[in-house]
Amino acid sequence: MANHEQIIEAIKEMSVLELNDLVKAIEEEFGVTAAAPVAVAGAAGGADAAAEKTEFDVELTSAGSSKIKVVKAVKEATGLGLKDAKELVDGAPKVIKEALPKEEAEKLKEQLEEVGATVELK
């Protein structure tokens, strides 16, 4: 069995993609998540802090009049192929991306709205 130093050295040599895969494998193997715990700010603000949503789904509700630009923006944002991005846009309302942090979700919403799409954060 490898000692701690050998494990740390092996991790240092990994690429970001390999580290991401390692984290996912550890999460699956041990039934845990690598998400940082959210601290609740005392009893008075506790209910508000717990109720605040931290992850959002970006839903395309309509492609609007410039469908081609929306398809290109969806393709770029999701990494899908052109055909898959077009099918996603044609099937609106559809969730484009799930469980994004608030800033990322708002940025994607802005990008899609700039090209004429109607978008909701859920």
UniProtKB/Swiss-Prot annotation:
One of its GO terms (molecular function) is structural constituent of ribosome. Pfam families: Ribosomal_L12 (PF00542), Ribosomal_L12_N (PF16320). It comes from Staphylococcus aureus (strain NCTC 8325 / PS 47). Homodimer. Part of the ribosomal stalk of the 50S ribosomal subunit. Forms a multimeric L10(L12)X complex, where L10 forms an elongated spine to which 2 to 4 L12 dimers bind in a sequential fashion. Binds GTP-bound translation factors. CDD domains: Ribosomal_L7_L12. Gene3D superfamilies: 3.30.1390.10, Single helix bin. SUPFAM superfamilies: ClpS-like (SSF54736), Ribosomal protein L7/12, oligomerisation (N-terminal) domain (SSF48300). Keywords: Ribonucleoprotein, Ribosomal protein. This is Large ribosomal subunit protein bL12. GO terms for cellular component: cytosolic large ribosomal subunit. GO terms for biological process: translation. Forms part of the ribosomal stalk which helps the ribosome interact with GTP-bound translation factors. Is thus essential for accurate translation. Belongs to the bacterial ribosomal protein bL12 family. PANTHER family: 39S RIBOSOMAL PROTEIN L12, LARGE RIBOSOMAL SUBUNIT PROTEIN BL12M.
